[in-house]
Amino acid sequence: MNRIAAIFAGALMLAPFSFARSAADENAKDENNRLQNAGTVMQEILDIPDDIPQDLLDKARCVVVLPSVLKAAFVVGGSYGRGTMVCRTGKDFRGPWGAPAMYALEGGSVGLQIGAEATDFVILVMNNRGAESLLHSKVKLGGDASVAAGPKGRTASADTDAYMRAEMLSYSRARGVFAGVSLEGSTLRPDNDANHRLYGPDATAALIITEPKYESPESGRALVHRLQKATPERKM
């Protein structure tokens, strides 16, 4: 009887550790799913010639992809969605695309009544200041960094004052309809917990994006490869 009681007590002591490990595994699975979904979104968008202008892709320092943001989040506020940011490596963000860092889009109501069950967002970061502002802290779009609804069409002109001044250009896709959309009033920040789960406890968004020792997990390679194929080097 004492032996049975000891086994039972031991099981009770180990249960919290087993639960914590199970929760951590599940969270890591969620992060990998986010990366895979982001790769799928980018693949589908770049396969359609009339979506993002090629010259904008060629000039972008970073690309933020937020797959399947639920409409309900816009009604109740709080967390809009979670995704990833991929940046070009090297000095002045001119090298090949690097490892993806995890990011979250948050904020109160910003008038985004998209009218769909889920919406994908893509944000192009167009200059060094915009990219560097996102590496370390939360950024309010339209406040800390200028943002504009991006133009559509591979041959669309991106040289107007509005697009040239904007640090970020934002797009949405709902029910297959792709369009520029303003995200002013929301915030974009590094998802530190997710980055730790994917890359280790010392990993930060800034280190993942700027240090060559960080390599993309397998789940993020399709996203990085698709961007590299579409725009292998940044143009001035």
Segments and roles (model prediction):
Residues 1-8:
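Bacterial N-terminal signal peptides that target proteins for export
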Residues 9-16:
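Bacterial N-terminal signal peptides
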Residues 21-236:
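Small-residue-enriched, tightly packed secondary-structure blocks
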